[in-house]
């Protein structure tokens, strides 16, 4: 009889967002007239930028002409896209990243999970708490953890609490860890990291031969010029960090699918015989074997992000969502709630009122004002008693949701 990967049985019954959908769908079925406003899953609502749409239409026409038709593309991504990314996203900020070190993919969610395939199972792994669930669940799936305790914490992971007491920036561990997940601007708390803070992590990683997985999916929302957009703006990061980025939240590619991972050629890991191995070569081998590349049409759309028109249009999109975040933050603060994030990030992190648990607040919001958010406990034990509200929605819906919430839950 065929056996299964028993690690999957360690996972919680439902991934956070499908569980939210299940509850919302059940409520909607029982209350068909309810006008539900969804501020939960971080999915964008505004259309693709015109520059991207125009480029993709042209790319479709290319595919209809024998002279410009494209078949299989390079697994790493077309050079014309990688070169623009290297120049505008990294080199323009003083980060010494070459186009050859960039890998185009169909999503940073996929990459943050797949990257584990090039690392051994004997690494000690650190995650923040609360944390984007994908980081934890993918480690469980590949066998890097033991079982979960009553709080949902898995044996074999080092949890680094991020709370209001430490400004939602995890303290560097006193013991040695091998792989470290950092996400800034942070999902779910909306916190940001200073250069000094990231430098401390880079120094720690260098001293301990550790690797940092740096998720910069929300870097476009940084408006403070003192906050770094990339970990490679920090001296020495090329030797210790892999960075993940996405076109989902800046250009609205959640349904179009395009992202990138940066693996510097100066980054190495240890083989079983103690020798140093270039991680770039391992990731390139993995991608060449298991991935056929992002479609030509989508990559042309992503390339248009770097045009003058594209840059102006994505800045407009980001500004729109940041204004939504500002409205959420200000309205909830005025209602007496404790509110964090939402300044250089599209997420607002709210302390639940009146001692309610995260899921109790979720159910109360859904049932009494028909607004959906994300329970903080779904991101980890330290998220209990908090709630994430997303700025990804129409202005009308955001304003209406705040009107409903503040009327019902004014402290």
Curated annotation (Swiss-Prot):
Names of the cofactor(s): pyridoxal 5'-phosphate
Annotated disulfide bonds: none
Binding sites annotated in the UniProt record for substrate: 15, 42, 109, 132, 187, 292, 388
Protein name, as recorded: LL-diaminopimelate aminotransferase
InterPro entries reported for this sequence: Aminotransferase_I/II_large, DapL/ALD1, PyrdxlP-dep_Trfase, PyrdxlP-dep_Trfase_major, PyrdxlP-dep_Trfase_small
Pathway membership: Amino-acid biosynthesis; L-lysine biosynthesis via DAP pathway; LL-2,6-diaminopimelate from (S)-tetrahydrodipicolinate (aminotransferase route): step 1/1
Binding site for pyridoxal 5'-phosphate: 72, 108-109, 132, 187, 218, 246-248, 257, 292
Single Gene Ontology BP annotation: lysine biosynthetic process via diaminopimelate, diaminopimelate-aminotransferase pathway
Source taxonomy: Bacteria, Bacillati, Cyanobacteriota, Cyanophyceae, Nostocales
């Amino acid at each position: 009889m065929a056996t299964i990967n028993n690690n999957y049985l360690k996972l919680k019954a439902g991934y956070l967002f499908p569980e939210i959908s299940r509850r919302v769908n059940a409520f909607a079925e029982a209350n068909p007239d309810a006008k539900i406003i969804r501020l939960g899953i971080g999915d964008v609502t505004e259309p693709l930028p015109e520059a991207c749409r125009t480029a993709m239409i042209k790319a479709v026409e290319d595919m209809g002409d024998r002279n410009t038709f494209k078949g299989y593309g390079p697994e790493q991504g077309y050079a014309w896209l990688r070169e623009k990314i290297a120049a505008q996203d990294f080199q323009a900020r003083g980060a010494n990243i070459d186009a050859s070190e960039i890998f185009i993919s169909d999503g940073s969610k996929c990459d943050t999970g797949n990257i584990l395939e090039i690392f051994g199972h004997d690494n000690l792994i650190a995650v923040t708490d609360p944390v984007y669930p994908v980081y934890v669940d993918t480690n469980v799936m590949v066998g890097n953890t033991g079982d979960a305790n009553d709080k949902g914490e898995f044996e074999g992971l080092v949890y680094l609490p991020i709370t209001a007491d430490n400004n939602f920036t995890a303290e560097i561990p006193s013991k040695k860890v091998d792989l470290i997940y950092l996400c800034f601007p942070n999902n779910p708390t909306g916190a940001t990291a200073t250069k000094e803070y990231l430098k401390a992590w880079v120094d720690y990683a260098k001293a301990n031969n550790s690797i940092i997985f740096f998720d910069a999916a929300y870097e476009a929302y940084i408006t403070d010029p003192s906050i770094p957009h990339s970990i490679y703006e920090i001296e020495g990061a090329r030797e210790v960090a892999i960075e993940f980025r996405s076109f989902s939240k800046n250009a609205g590619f959640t349904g179009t699918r395009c992202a990138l991972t940066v693996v510097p050629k100066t980054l190495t890991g240890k083989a079983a015989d103690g020798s140093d191995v270039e991680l770039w070569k391992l990731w390139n081998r993995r991608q060449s074997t298991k991935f056929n590349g992002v479609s030509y049409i989508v990559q042309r759309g992503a390339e248009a992000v770097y045009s003058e028109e594209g840059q102006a249009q994505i800045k407009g999109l980001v500004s729109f969502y940041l204004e939504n975040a500002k409205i959420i933050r200000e309205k909830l603060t005025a209602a007496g709630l404790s509110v964090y994030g939402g300044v250089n990030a599209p997420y607002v992190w709210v302390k639940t009122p009146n001692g309610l648990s995260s899921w109790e607040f979720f159910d109360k919001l859904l049932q009494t004002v028909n607004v959906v958010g994300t329970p903080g406990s779904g991101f980890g034990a330290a998220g209990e008693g908090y709630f994430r509200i997303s700025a990804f929605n129409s202005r009308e819906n955001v304003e209406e949701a705040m009107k409903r919430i503040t009327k019902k839950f004014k402290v």
